[in-house]
Amino acid sequence: MKSYGFAATDAREPLVPFTFERRAPRPNDVVMEILYSGVCHSDLHMARNDWHWTVYPLVPGHEIVGRVIEIGSDVTRYKVGDHVAVGCMVDSCLECDQCGRGEEQLCRNGNTGTYNAPDRITGDITRGGYSKHLVVREEFACRIPDGLDLSRAAPLLCAGITTYSPLRTWNVGPGSRVGVIGLGGLGHMAVKLAAAMGAEVTVLSRSSGKAEDALALGADKLLISTDAEAMKAAQSSFDLIVDTVPVKHDLDPYLPLLDVDGTLVIVGQVGPMSAFNSVPMLLGRRRVAGSPIGGIRQTQELLDFCARKNVLPDVEMIRMDQINEAFDRMERSDVRYRFVIDMASLQASQ
């Protein structure tokens, strides 16, 4: 089917209007009209080929909210008119043990990314949510619950599930002591979600200027990581620290903050980490772990949780033709805390 959107054609060029062919729907597919598309920092990395695996032309976008406009003959979960959401995956083998556990993000045979990935059947490169339509296997679409604001829901499909998944994996709830390093797109969601789960939440920041923002998002306090006395007083005071910082940084100041059996989980940095001292880990039975996104079942759980608890990302709405300006602002950390494209603006941008 004919579709259109915005694409990166080269690492050095801005995104431009792009017309392309979506694959024909299969019997178990739903076709979505995209209403809102979140702008993830990984979209910028992929457009600029920072990770050296981008295939051009690239249509980014893996935080997608839309309306079903067509269903395949075997589809049972959705009907035309339903509001659905799609995140970072559009397929997996659905046969391995990980898929059987509802952890398609850890598929033994590799999941299919929403964009810049080979289709499991044809090998064609997938194209993402900066576009008019999406064709997706029904198992990889989540239902938008009643009461969840469609215009603000899109970032839940990446920033939301990326932080929700480790909070659930490490059983965060009332009485849990959670630290969050970084207060950007991921960090602000980690704070909101952990607070909604009943945890005591502390934002760890190099700047005291983040205090007002941290408290407004639901944190109980701010810990200044450059304050040696405050950091010493906070030793052994966290069960879980969620590290959302997207660049290489030193973990040594944070490991002593974990209590016995505590975990620092990395969700923001993709690539080499700084070396860190293993002594605090050995002496305190502490752990450093990583966590990607969650599976489809957990993503649906997140959407239902956010509807029930009224947890939504803080977003700035933009038009499609403002995407290059948004990318520039993201590089300057000039957004609180996530851009969302109103895809109704797409046609006027062509």
Task: Report the location of each language-model feature.
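Helix-to-beta-strand junctions that scaffold the AdoMet/dcAdoMet cofactor pocket
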Residues: 258-259
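C-terminal hydrophobic helical "lid"/dimerization subdomain
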Residues: 1-3, 296-350
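NAD(P)H dinucleotide-binding glycine-rich loop of Rossmann-like/cofactor-binding domains
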Residues: 77, 93-181
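Adenosine-nucleotide cofactor-binding segment
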Residues: 174-183, 193-253
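Glycine-rich beta-strand-centered segment in the early N-terminal region that forms part
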Residues: 23-37, 50-100, 105, 127, ...
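Short glycine-centered segments of the SAM/dcSAM-binding site in methyltransferase folds
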Residues: 83, 177, 262-263, 287
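Rossmann-fold dehydrogenase core element
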Residues: 263-265, 276-316
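N-terminal Rossmann-fold NAD(P) dinucleotide-binding loop
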Residues: 187-188
